[in-house]
Amino acid sequence: MAAIIVVGAQWGDEGKGKATDILGGQVDYVVKPNGGNNAGHTVVVGGEKYELKLLPAGILSDNATSIIGNGCVVNLEALFEEIDGLQARGADTSHLRVSANAQLVAPYHVAIDRVSERFLGKRAIGTTGRGIGPTYQDKVGRVGIRAQDLLDESILRQKIESALDKKNQMLVKMYNRRAIEPEEVVQYFLSYADRLAPMLIDSSKVLNEALDRGERVLMEGGQATMLDVDHGTYPFVTSSNPTTGGACVGSGVGPTRITSSLGIIKAYTTRVGAGPFPTELFDKWGEYLQTTGGEVGVNTGRPRRCGWYDSVIARYASRVNGFTDYFLTKLDVLTGIGEIPICVAYDVDGVRHDEMPMTQTEFHHATPIYETMPAWDEDITGCRTFEELPEKAQDYVKRLEELSGCRMSYIGVGPGRDQTIVINDILKD
């Protein structure tokens, strides 16, 4: 039995898709426990590039059943567009299942998300405008629509009519937009009911029975630790808990069944959207990382903000997630840059902080304290063992390991599935 959680350790886009793709071929189930089509994965298989949003990266593994968990919010139009796109490229999606308890994104969620961001103006959080936040708000407010509701039209209709009593008042009176007809939303959902119904399962039951049989389960977290609604840079966060604890809740698998928690972390740092970012670069090196690393959001198309590696955040992520291992990605991007600064602590109004400041005010005032290490000039994209890496690259990885509070068990040296160095195989430990 093995239950592994994959979690982003920074602000997302760390390469979780690659990690899941590599491990997904060795497990029996891959479950996405949180998020929706607001976060994307890029996976390269056989030279083919796949950009996944709502679907787990494990969908590209023929041997694994992929599950969209109860902690997810599902836009059905986006789901089936993604499925159809993969099938058109020859991918098999017949092994995809959806938790009956997953929340559904309604057209009014998307409308409210988009208009509210415009209404906020300069105070906008920087959402993707896909209705994720409003859907989670309805979930917590106990007025959400779940996937299983499509199996009973009377319940579906009742929930939609009740929701629109309030939503339309908000759209019309607060945002000066047109009201949405309940029947329009009912028909939208019913148009997908026949296709969705065969996919629905009790995901908690399925996953726990699989573990009882000694099978392997991989939980593929969306977004990242610093976007967690509790542990991230609030309010510049997502609306779910993309941390280890949230993965347990969003999949229905208890914490005592988890055998490994794998943090995915870049050899530098990126962020999309608004919010504090202590190591952010505004010079030629920021542009270099953005260009060389291909740092453009899969979902939004927005350029990612880039900065140096932040070990304060890495230590924080190790602590709140209980990571057993790290998967370091994009080490190859740092080849040939001369010197590599590493943030080892923060200066906050003249006081050194080796750990995350307690308040967001302090974090906004944090300036990085750097140490530097020499970069390497050799091409590392063909390295397949740690010993094959140049000595300077080895030293950089070892220093990150010392600073981050967790062993570096995997190292990405290129975008391909095979461009990975495995130091400790967590499926064999």
Curated annotation (Swiss-Prot):
Catalytic residues as annotated in Swiss-Prot or TrEMBL: D13 (proton acceptor), H41 (proton donor)
Gene: purA
Record's keyword terms, sorted: Cytoplasm, GTP-binding, Ligase, Magnesium, Metal-binding, Nucleotide-binding, Purine biosynthesis
Entry note: cofactor: Binds 1 Mg(2+) ion per subunit.
Residues binding GTP, per UniProt: 12-18, 40-42, 304, 330-332, 412-414
Organism per entry: Corynebacterium urealyticum (strain ATCC 43042 / DSM 7109)
Metabolic or biological pathway: Purine metabolism; AMP biosynthesis via de novo pathway; AMP from IMP: step 1/2
Cofactor(s) demanded: Mg(2+)
GO BP of this protein: 'de novo' AMP biosynthetic process; IMP metabolic process
Source organism superkingdom: Bacteria
UniProt entry tagged with the keyword DNA-binding: no
Location of the protein in the cell: Cytoplasm
EC number of this enzyme: 6.3.4.4
Entry binding sites for substrate: V298, N299, T300, G301, R302, P303, R304
UniProt protein name: Adenylosuccinate synthetase
Similarity annotation: Belongs to the adenylosuccinate synthetase family.
GO cellular component: cytoplasm
Top enzyme category: ligase
UniProt keyword Membrane, yes or no: no
Sites where the protein binds IMP: D13, E14, G15, K16, N38, A39, G40, H41, T128, R142, Q223, T238, R302
Role played: Plays an important role in the de novo pathway of purine nucleotide biosynthesis. Catalyzes the first committed step in the biosynthesis of AMP from IMP.
Residues that coordinate or bind Mg(2+): D13, G40
Molecular function in Gene Ontology: adenylosuccinate synthase activity; GTP binding; magnesium ion binding
One Pfam family, short name: Adenylsucc_synt
InterPro entries associated with the record: Adenylosuccin_syn_GTP-bd, Adenylosuccin_syn_Lys_AS, Adenylosuccinate_synth_dom1, Adenylosuccinate_synth_dom2, Adenylosuccinate_synth_dom3, Adenylosuccinate_synthetase, P-loop_NTPase
